[in-house]
Regions:
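Acidic/histidine-rich helix-loop elements
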Residues: 123, 128-146, 168, 247-284
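Metal-dependent phosphoester-hydrolase catalytic domains
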Residues: 21-36, 41-76, 83-86, 94-95, ...
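Short hydrophobic/aromatic-enriched beta-strand-loop microsegments
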Residues: 129, 183-189, 327-334
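Active-site beta-strand/loop signature of hydrolases that rely on acidic residues for catalysis
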Residues: 125-131, 145-173, 226, 237-242, ...
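Structured beta-strand-rich core segments of catalytic domains in phosphoester-bond hydrolases
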Residues: 39, 62, 81-82, 89-123, ...
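N-terminal Lys/Arg-rich, disordered targeting/topogenic segments
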Residues: 1-19
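Short, solvent-exposed loop/turn segments at secondary-structure boundaries
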Residues: 137-143, 215-217, 344-346
């Protein structure tokens, strides 16, 4: 009897470990698919209603990876349950297509635009680039960054430049416009200025500018447009935009890296600090939603071909992207490859810079006809592999 009682008290601890693993898997089985349902819905829900939808959009790549990993794991143990994870991914098939693109067999060479310009005159190349003030505040490498960015622009030989966070000192050693004029950009939009420098968004073009203005209701620091005269006489309206910054300070950046590296450090109030970052993200998303509505409404009334380029500060799985992209073609989804990541600085390290376009409206219907829409198509898209700014440049060759 003594031995039997003693045997009852023995425990190897293995069942407890299995139990904790089971609880973790059970939680993940519920959280991950629900998170992906949330990412599917977040592009339709204005961020002012539920702030968490913005955060779910940012978590989308990690939720997909977690769902795929759990689906494969369950495939070996609980085959029916694995369908939950794959169904959640399938629900987000469109969002997945916005986030990653497979290579094309007929992808043209990056230098093909200039080589074929004589035989294919009905196309233009656009370069959109947040130049981060041309590195003006990089005190140890100010002129070096400016010169490298200007050199990159010259090598790309785009017909249209959409530059965000443009900066040009009135001091003689920092004259950007003169450099760009020598590269063939004889036309540009008006720049904001004070006593010492020019700044803001800017459109530079090899084509004549017929008209330029700001988008009603928005600051020229957020968006402006210009009507360009293409070869042959057609008009192209070009918008460039820079939506509100997330306004992360050095403390936020340090906390973010600490959260990644020391998630269990009790010396920091993570809940309060992480909540501060989440509130900044949600606040910016609400501002972005209103800004894109105004850009969208203005562009929708334009009868000409439309090109919209800029820094959205939002990833593709967001309400702002979905609102602006509806009815437009995204050059990346037409001809891009890979993840298309454009932000190389602090969070969010996703695709947040875009080139959209649409054909001219049919005068009879006020809508884009199928024939006109088919003619305006992206032939080539590329994310520049340079780190001269905290953003990478993006370019597209578009047939019209």
């Amino acid at each position: 009897m003594g031995k039997a009682g003693g045997n009852k008290k023995k425990s190897t601890g293995t069942p407890r470990r299995v139990s904790w693993l089971g609880v973790l898997l059970l939680l993940m089985t519920g959280i991950v698919p629900l998170g992906l349902v949330g990412t599917f819905l977040c592009v339709y829900i204005p961020p002012g209603r539920f702030g968490i939808t913005t955060l779910l959009g940012l978590a989308f790549p990690w939720l997909v990876l977690a769902s795929a990993a759990l689906g494969i794991a369950y495939l070996f143990f609980f085959k029916k349950r694995c369908l939950i994870f794959f169904a959640a991914i399938l629900l987000n098939f469109h969002n997945l297509g916005l986030s990653v693109r497979l290579p094309h067999n007929d992808r043209p060479r990056r230098d093909d635009h200039r080589m074929a310009s004589a035989t294919r005159p009905s196309e233009f190349k656009v370069l959109s680039y947040n130049v981060c003030l041309f590195g003006y505040y990089a005190q140890d490498d100010r002129n070096g960054r400016k010169d490298r960015i200007a050199s990159y622009i010259g090598v790309e030989e785009a017909d249209i430049l959409c530059l965000q966070e443009y900066y040009e000192s009135k001091a003689p050693q920092f004259r950007i416009r003169e450099t760009l004029r020598k590269a063939g950009y004889r036309h540009h939009t008006r720049l904001l200025e004070n006593a010492r420098f020019y700044f803001g968004n800017a459109i530079f073009s090899r084509f004549p500018i017929l008209r330029q203005d700001t988008v009603p209701g928005l600051s020229p620091l957020n968006a402006l447009y210009a009507d360009l005269q293409l070869p042959g006489g057609d008009t192209l309206r070009v918008y460039t935009f820079h939506l509100a910054s997330l306004r992360f300070d050095d403390h936020d950046k340090a906390l973010y890296h600490e959260l990644l590296n020391k998630p269990l450090d009790e010396s920091v109030s993570y809940k309060a600090e992480a909540g501060k970052i989440a509130r900044k993200v949600s606040r910016a998303a609400r501002i972005h939603a209103e800004q894109v509505r105004q850009i969208k409404a203005h562009a929708a009334a334009c009868p000409y071909r439309v090109l919209i380029c800029g820094d959205m500060n939002e990833n593709p799985v967001s309400y702002a992207y979905h609102t602006l992209a509806k009815g437009l073609k995204d050059a990346f989804t037409e001809r891009g490859v890979g993840l298309g990541r454009t932000y190389s600085g602090f969070f969010p390290a996703y695709r947040i810079d875009y080139i959209f376009h649409r054909a001219a409206l049919d005068p009879a219907t006020g809508k884009v006809s199928d024939g006109m829409d088919a003619r305006l198509a992206t032939r080539h898209f590329e994310v520049g592999a340079v780190d001269y700014s905290d953003h990478r440049p993006i370019s597209a060759v578009i047939n019209y």
